[in-house]
From Swiss-Prot:
Gene Ontology molecular function terms on file: bent DNA binding; DNA-binding transcription factor activity; sequence-specific DNA binding
PANTHER family cross-referenced by the UniProt entry: HTH-TYPE TRANSCRIPTIONAL REGULATOR ARGP, TRANSCRIPTIONAL REGULATOR
Location of the DNA-binding region in this protein: 21-40
One Pfam family hit: HTH_1
NCBIfam families with a match to the protein in the record: argP, PRK03635.1, PRK13348.1
Keyword annotations from UniProtKB, A to Z: Activator, DNA-binding, Transcription, Transcription regulation
Family listed: Belongs to the LysR transcriptional regulatory family.
Record comment: activity regulation: Specifically cleaved by the protease DegP. Cleaved ArgP can no longer interact with the oriC region in vitro. Cleavage may play an important role in the control of the protein availability.
Subunit structure: Homodimer.
Annotated protein name in UniProt: HTH-type transcriptional regulator ArgP
Organism whose genome encodes this protein: Escherichia coli (strain K12)
SUPFAM superfamilies linked to this entry: Periplasmic binding protein-like II, Winged helix' DNA-binding domain
Organism lineage string: Bacteria, Pseudomonadati, Pseudomonadota, Gammaproteobacteria, Enterobacterales
A Gene Ontology biological process term: positive regulation of DNA-templated transcription
UniProt keyword Cell division, yes or no: no
Length: 297
């Protein structure tokens, strides 16, 4: 069985994290040549490339598996060392999360863990349809995803659902929908998406109003919080989690444009198996809080 030297795995990890050999060398406090030699040693051991030499470099499928192995080893080392870690650098936990979870329930869920445990969070924001890929590539140790099936050597639990409402301000609704929300009126009403791959509003409008993708004017804004601001100021109509705008809906600052119609996104928590002691704390915190505030039906 091939047993890689974890120094060489750390070199591979550094090249990916630092997006190049030069910065990886600086991070590891070794020469760039030494980084190249360590990766070449790994590639010779496995008889195949582990990096695609693009700019920035990216791992091959085998490279992804090795990075995933490194993440598991780092977490298990923390558990094995236990109290001997006291006073050392806090453990780094890299998690892939969707922006709407980050803007609503995730940070309150993690508050007890952050208060009681010496950890550093590296929260990587990605669409919930793509977070699991970061776990597959070994970039993170846990992911909030809409995928219900676990990856090999991983665990998965249901967190609950976010219900997205199609909302706007009252002045916006009066301007664009004086006769109600209709297919023809929607063609002129600007919406907003998180990025070019965010298709939630397109799916909602196609399903309920038979509007094909790309038929309505759309802003691109990479911020969940900005969605709320844009809607409040009367700039757009948009899909926002009910959990994020409960106060605005109660006060009438925002209105549900299509009562009874919504998009539901069921979320799942994925992580490597076996779990370290610290990851078990994170899992318990996320599941406990998620089951309280997210839809469970």
């Amino acid at each position: 069985m091939k047993r890689p030297d974890y120094r060489t795995l750390q070199a591979l990890d550094a090249v990916i994290r630092e997006r190049g050999f030069e910065r990886a060398a600086q991070k590891l406090c070794i020469t760039q040549s030494a980084v190249s030699q360590r990766i070449k040693q790994l590639e010779n051991m496995f008889g195949q490339p582990l990096l695609v030499r693009t700019v920035p470099p990216r791992p091959t499928e085998q490279g992804q598996k090795l990075l995933a192995l490194l993440r598991q080893v780092e977490l298990l080392e923390e558990e094995w060392l236990g109290d001997e870690q006291t006073g050392s650098t806090p453990l780094l936990l890299s998690l892939a999360v969707n922006a709407d979870s980050l803007a609503t329930w995730l940070l309150p869920a993690l508050a007890p863990v952050l208060a009681d445990s010496p950890i550093r969070l590296n929260l990587q924001v990605e669409d919930e349809t793509r977070t699991q890929e970061r776990l597959r590539r070994g970039e993170v140790v846990g992911a909030v995803s809409i995928q219900h099936q676990a990856l090999p050597s991983c665990l998965v639990d249901k967190l609950g659902a976010l219900d997205y409402l199609f909302v706007s301000s009252k002045p916006f609704a009066e301007k664009y929908f004086p006769n109600g929300v209709t297919r023809s009126a929607l063609l002129k009403a600007p919406v907003v998406a998180f990025d070019h791959l965010d298709d939630m509003h397109q799916a909602f409008l196609q399903q309920n109003f038979d509007l094909p993708p790309g038929s309505v004017p759309c802003h691109i804004v990479n911020s969940s919080e900005a969605f709320v601001q844009l809607a409040r100021q009367g700039t757009t109509c948009c899909m926002i989690p009910h959990l994020q705008i409960e106060k605005e809906l109660a006060s009438g600052e925002l209105i549900d444009l299509t009562p009874g119609l919504f998009q539901r996104r069921m979320l799942y928590w994925h992580r490597f198996a076996p779990e370290s002691r610290m990851m078990r704390k994170v899992t318990d915190a996320l599941l406990d809080y998620g089951h309280k505030v997210l839809r469970q039906d």
